[in-house]
Amino acid sequence: MTALVGGVHTRRGFAIRTVATCAALATAIWLSTQLHCTPALHHAALLIHLASLVLGFGAVLAVDYFAVAWVLRRTPLREMLTVADRLQLPIWLGVTGLVASGVLLEPNIANHTTQTKMALVVALTLNGLQASAFTDRVAAHGGILDRPLIARGALTLLISQACWWGALWIGFWNTTNHV
């Protein structure tokens, strides 16, 4: 899932993934303005959206739990890294499912809260790409982490949580207020 050369994450591979991700997200936003769904398809998309939220955010919460457990010295670094690596697939399947089903939910992109949610989704996706590169770097350090690396990990976790919870709250708000 990540481009490694001698245990070091390549900048070119990261840049390619970042550009491809931004292009995919921009395409999804554009498609959401072009597609019009039947009520049955809308309901199916909502179910997929909720299932993807459970899958992706649940996996993120598990990874973050192990990260906090490592900081509190309740679990070894190797176990935290193993969990983070193994949960990459459900995280990215969840994010992909959220974006794909979100296209079919006909978001009101003129609404400021919807625009904020889309910005949060872009931020959490780019933060997720950066988090993958970060865990590769941590693994390459062999368990010896300096303060800047620990600070980067904490910031990654905080950004992740803020984006996921923010997008979740806005989605709930928009749905209950029929925005």
Label every PLM stretch briefly.
Residues 2-179:
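Polytopic transmembrane helical bundles with strong interfacial aromatic enrichment
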